[in-house]
């Protein structure tokens, strides 16, 4: 497949997604690295702020009802519920992929899926990495616009914050689809984004919080980690806070705002601070992304917290280190994993429909909670959630490829 990266080594997205490279290392080494976390930073910066959760209400559920919902979310090999028909592959397209930050395993997982699907289509792909900064995003868009794409995928950045750049694409008649660029799946109102591909973030957050309630038998002491720069993150943290507040025996200790791009610098110190402040009252950490735990785990280990002494659950996206921690039973007990590779294929399918003058499919994948009981299935042996539902064959059949 023609593939022209604009960042060094971007043509090897597997390495970016999983620096632990499981196909080249032993499981013993992987588990040691998972305990230690990844990308350990010598510099520790204080100062992420606490934020009050917004008022979102949820009706309290019985423990039996809670457990039933959690069990349903952990089912494996769920049948395909996406599109079965659509236009054949439109020829000769070039796609620009603007990534918020390729240190985010979710974004790189989507990029891998897009790359697979583009290769199947016979199209061309270039990836522009914003590296997690506003200046980087501006530069990435400038380069993407200058490359004159036929279509653009916005991955992990808030669409409303980039609306001026997206409007330039719309004025050229360039279709835009996105991943995690808004608070819900579907078109993003007020922007040219025709389809925001994501599982339902409200349901993702609900399942994550209910997982903590079920684990603790209704007595969880919870800290929530979020990034208020992103609407989807705020939606998730507000819903999780609401679920915990609705649990009579649970305690919402704190909602902490930490920029994902700063997690490497700030999470070690924040983890130490939270341990000192709440002690054994802190039983569960809920985060809007697994990456926070990459940097919290070394601090927990250093503090002598037993691996079962604090339960970490993430409302996205199912990173390789998260799978390793769950398999090894090292702090993290769950992640509501996005089917990242499948969503990459869906993004390409949605663009193909737009190129053909057809409406988007609007498909929303069901929510899936990965835990110790199902982590080995549906792609778990490759440290990802890759549903065993035949999506690749189905899309190839639709595209006549």
Regions found by a protein language model. Name each.
Residues 160, 164-203, 221, 320-325, ...:
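Flexible loop/hinge segments that line or gate small-molecule binding clefts
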Residues 119-131, 221-223, 244-264, 309:
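Short beta-strand elements in bilobed, periplasmic/extracellular small-molecule ligand-binding domains
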Residues 51-113, 126-138, 143, 156-159, ...:
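Extracytoplasmic "Venus flytrap"
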Residues 49-93, 244, 339, 343-401:
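Hinge/cleft segment of the Venus flytrap/periplasmic-binding protein
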Residues 137, 195-222, 234-235, 267-268, ...:
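Hydrophobic alpha-helical segments within soluble ligand-binding/sensing domains
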Residues 156-171, 240, 259-325:
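Hydrophobic alpha-helical
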Residues 79-81, 125-148, 255-278, 293-296:
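Structural motif
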Residues 95-99, 103-104, 114, 206-257, ...:
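An alpha-beta-alpha
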